[in-house]
A protein has these predicted regions:
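Small-aliphatic-rich amphipathic alpha-helix that forms the alpha element of a beta-alpha
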Residues: 11, 35-36, 81, 96-121
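N-terminal amphipathic, basic helical "cap/leader" segment at the start of enzyme domains
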Residues: 1-80
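Short, flexible active-site-adjacent loop segments at beta-strand->alpha-helix junctions, enriched
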Residues: 55, 87, 121
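Helix-adjacent hinge/juxtasegments
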Residues: 67-108
Length: 121
């Protein structure tokens, strides 16, 4: 348990990147793997990850994530992940009260958090 808390204490939200230093594909794959292993309601896994390392694709996607002048750090970022919430149909056998609940935003947040913790490691 203490290893986990050490990881939580070390994690940071990095905004300073060297655009000339690529991120190793294996590190990106491990982060994505950690994200895919996140818990989700009824194992719905309502997420898709697009790992962007191609400079041309990154140039097309950056403006979509920089609305209101935010996320300017992406201009220097050599790789990033786009997390997409996918629609899921959760079969609820235990209770009808849960059938119209939207758990996907919470599940996606869990998944993205695990991606970030893996990046810290």
């Amino acid at each position: 348990m203490s290893d986990y808390f050490d990881l939580v204490k070390r994690r940071e939200s990095c905004r300073n990147f060297d655009p000339n230093r690529p991120v190793e594909p294996e590190k990106l794959r491990r982060c994505a793997e950690a994200a895919w292993l996140a818990p989700s309601a009824c194992n719905g896994q309502p997420w898709k990850y697009l790992i962007v390392t191609n400079p041309e694709l990154a140039a097309k996607l950056r403006p979509l994530m920089q609305g209101l002048g935010m996320n300017k750090f992406l201009n220097e970022c050599p790789a990033f992940a786009v997390v997409v919430q996918e629609p899921t149909v959760i079969k609820v056998s235990a209770s009808q009260r849960l059938k119209d609940q939207d758990f996907a935003p919470i599940d996606v947040a869990f998944s993205a958090s695990q991606f970030c913790y893996a990046a810290t490691e």
